[in-house]
């Protein structure tokens, strides 16, 4: 946001926003005069100028001032102090993730819980996903004479399982050979490409058996279903932390928050933007394209492996959010998740930038 403010006005704006974030109460000039070392009249004049600039507003003629969305934006971009997590907090978070470093599905739930606790507001996390789901490998495991377990592993680490009917005479050794052939045919392929393999067999390859076609079609279908269920992949935590804020004292606001977090579709609209962006994204109040989110601020960051597999971590809260702490928390958790992804894939991780 490009707006020139002299040093005194910057100090007044910063003080108003910090006090309003702490108290949720409009700020009067006499509240700031002593801490800023100037008279109440001087503070009133500066507040009036900041209101004329669209950075502050007031609810009633005699009431104190509170920030506008533009005021919060100026604060985030120009005034706020860094609020890095303490060394003790960082070590505790790293230890928690280290204990489940090989359990990708548990990372997501832990990330949401840790972020909610650290930022003291609602947290949202999506699992790492390839920009387009890609096949990594399958295993075929004999269950009994009539059933085979298909285990599908996608490149981003997701695992899908289903049972398939099998010929009673098929041995585990034969199943392993079939899995090996399909792994070669489908290496790094998308769902669409795998579906084509089943229906357009190459003349350069031995023909596929009916069971191999069944397996390949099942793989393609599972990958397509995975790509279609985005809503179910947004995990959240911290509803109670968020509802402790005074903005959510009314039942209608509680229902609104539940709709945003449980419904998923409103937050889902923000995920593609976060996946396509570098660094931490801060969206404040009226900057949202959806009316339902205009009383909220959202802070999001991408994590994962560059150019390949990525997810999103973030927080949702009132516009009166503790931005320095929330931004640092999101950035740190995104960095931890990227480290885990880099270790898992042995590839270049995404570094959350400033």
Swiss-Prot record:
GO molecular function: DNA binding
Keyword check for Transcription regulation: yes
Tree of life domain: Bacteria
GO biological process, one term: negative regulation of DNA-templated transcription
Pfam families: HrcA (PF01628), HTH_11 (PF08279)
Keywords: Repressor, Stress response, Transcription, Transcription regulation
Family statement: Belongs to the HrcA family.
Record function comment: Negative regulator of class I heat shock genes (grpE-dnaK-dnaJ and groELS operons). Prevents heat-shock induction of these operons.
UniProt name for this protein: Heat-inducible transcription repressor HrcA
Originating organism: Herpetosiphon aurantiacus (strain ATCC 23779 / DSM 785 / 114-95)
């Amino acid at each position: 946001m490009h707006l020139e403010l002299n040093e005194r006005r910057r100090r007044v704006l910063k003080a108003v926003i910090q006090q309003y974030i702490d108290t949720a109460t409009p700020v009067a000039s006499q509240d700031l005069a002593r801490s800023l070392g100037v008279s109440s009249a001087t503070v009133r004049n500066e507040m009036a100028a900041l209101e004329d600039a669209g950075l502050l507003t007031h609810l009633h003629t005699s009431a104190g001032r509170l920030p506008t969305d533009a005021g919060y934006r100026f604060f985030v971009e120009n005034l706020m102090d860094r609020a890095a997590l303490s060394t003790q907090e960082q070590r505790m978070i790293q230890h928690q993730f280290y204990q489940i470093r090989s359990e990708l599905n548990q990372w997501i739930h832990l990330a949401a819980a840790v972020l909610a606790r650290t930022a003291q507001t609602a947290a949202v996390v999506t699992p790492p996903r390839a920009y387009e789901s890609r096949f990594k490998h399958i295993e075929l495991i004999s269950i009994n004479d009539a059933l085979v377990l298909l285990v599908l592993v996608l490149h981003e680490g997701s695992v899908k399982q289903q049972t398939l009917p099998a010929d009673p005479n098929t041995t585990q050794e034969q199943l392993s050979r079939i899995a090996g052939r399909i792994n070669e045919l489908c290496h790094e392929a998308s769902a669409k490409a795998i579906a084509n393999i089943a229906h357009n067999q190459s003349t350069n390859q031995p023909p596929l058996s009916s069971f191999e076609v069944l397996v390949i079609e099942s793989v393609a279908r599972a990958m397509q279903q995975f790509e279609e269920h985005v809503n179910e992949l947004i995990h959240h935590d911290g509803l109670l932390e968020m509802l402790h804020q005074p903005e959510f004292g009314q039942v209608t606001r509680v229902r609104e928050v539940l709709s945003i977090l449980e419904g998923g579709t409103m937050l889902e609209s923000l995920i593609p933007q976060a996946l396509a962006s570098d660094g931490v994204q801060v969206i404040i109040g009226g900057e949202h394209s959806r009316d339902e989110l205009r009383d909220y601020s959202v802070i999001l960051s991408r994590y994962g492996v560059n150019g390949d597999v990525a997810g999103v971590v973030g927080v949702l809260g009132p516009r009166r959010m503790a931005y320095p702490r929330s931004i640092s928390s999101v950035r740190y958790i995104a960095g931890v998740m990227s480290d885990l992804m880099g270790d898992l894939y042995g590839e270049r991780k995404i570094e959350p930038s400033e």
